[in-house]
């Protein structure tokens, strides 16, 4: 199977552009409503989520009709090519309905072995983080820059992010907190933007649990192209979701993984 860098990247950018156009009219709108997808807890979905995924699916229908699609809002559509586009139209809908610009559009092009292309796009700020076999770059208000993870060697110097303070189950929270006790700084509530910052060399670790494939495949594509590592908490592949450890480099990954494995 070959990767056509030019055309696949063009399609991915067109999808991200379409999602931006669909989402931004809804952001910080006073009359925006959210439905709860859970009977217990709160997992919101809005008209913006659905409009963005539909816009991306329309792009794929024009340019990649033989590829499969897996989107958070409209599920899976089988393809014939052996490739699948994995979409989260708004990762961080809780942040979206709260008006914080930490949410993003996640796009991945994947095979059964995992992502070969990833995008994390923040429409309101105007930043786009892209990873592919051709490299990793970000574009934004200040131009274009190469993405490269940093080389922090010690947990004592590391910056750690997660989205929810509880992380997941009590055991998962305990594992996260065991790492957090060793790092220099821990921050919460960043949604997918934390992974983008890791790829950009601002963050050393992101540790989460309970993820779906569409929550992590886009970030994997970006982080790995920028030189980082993304695994589960046992060191295995993370592209199917679950417990995720994203790290800037092999040393900091090994240090965090050693703690998580022991919990």
What do the predicted segments below correspond to?
Residues 1-90, 258:
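N-terminal subdomain of lithium-sensitive/metallo-dependent phosphomonoesterases centered on the IMPase/IPPase/PAP
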Residues 12, 16-19, 118, 219, ...:
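Small-residue (primarily alanine) positions within well-ordered alpha-helices
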Residues 23, 49, 60, 93, ...:
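Residue-level signal for inorganic ion chemistry
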Residues 50, 54, 73, 89-92, ...:
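Generic detector of well-ordered alpha-helical packing
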Residues 66-73, 142-143, 227-229:
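Short gly/ser/thr-rich secondary-structure transition/capping motifs
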Residues 79-137, 156-158:
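DPxDG-like acidic metal-binding loop motif
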Residues 110-114, 124, 133-135, 141-142, ...:
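Short loop segments at secondary-structure junctions
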Residues 148-263:
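An extended, acidic
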């Amino acid at each position: 199977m070959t990767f056509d860098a030019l055309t696949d990247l063009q399609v991915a950018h067109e999808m991200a552009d379409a999602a931006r156009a669909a989402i931004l009219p809804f952001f910080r709108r006073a009359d925006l409503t959210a439905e709860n997808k859970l009977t217990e807890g709160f997992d919101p979905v809005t008209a913006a989520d659905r409009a963005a995924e539909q816009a991306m699916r329309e792009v794929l229908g024009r340019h990649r009709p033989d590829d499969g699609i897996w989107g958070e809002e409209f599920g899976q559509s089988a393809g014939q090519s052996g490739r699948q586009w994995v979409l989260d139209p708004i990762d961080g809908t809780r942040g979206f309905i709260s008006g914080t610009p930490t949410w993003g559009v996640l796009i991945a092009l994947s095979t059964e072995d995992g992502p070969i292309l990833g995008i994390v796009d923040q429409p309101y700020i105007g930043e786009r983080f892209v990873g592919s076999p051709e490299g990793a770059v970000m574009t934004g208000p200040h131009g274009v820059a190469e993405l490269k993870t940093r080389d922090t060697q010690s947990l004592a110097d590391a910056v750690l992010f997660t989205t929810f303070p509880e992380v997941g189950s009590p055991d998962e929270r305990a594992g996260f907190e065991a790492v957090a006790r060793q790092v220099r700084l821990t921050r919460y509530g960043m949604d997918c933007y934390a992974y983008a910052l890791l790829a950009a060399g601002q963050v050393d670790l992101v540790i989460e649990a309970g993820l779906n494939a569409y929550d992590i495949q886009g970030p994997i594509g970006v982080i790995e192209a920028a030189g980082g590592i993304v695994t589960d908490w046992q060191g295995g592949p993370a592209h199917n979701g679950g417990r995720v450890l994203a790290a800037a480099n092999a040393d900091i990954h090994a240090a965090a993984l050693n703690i998580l494995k022991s919990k």
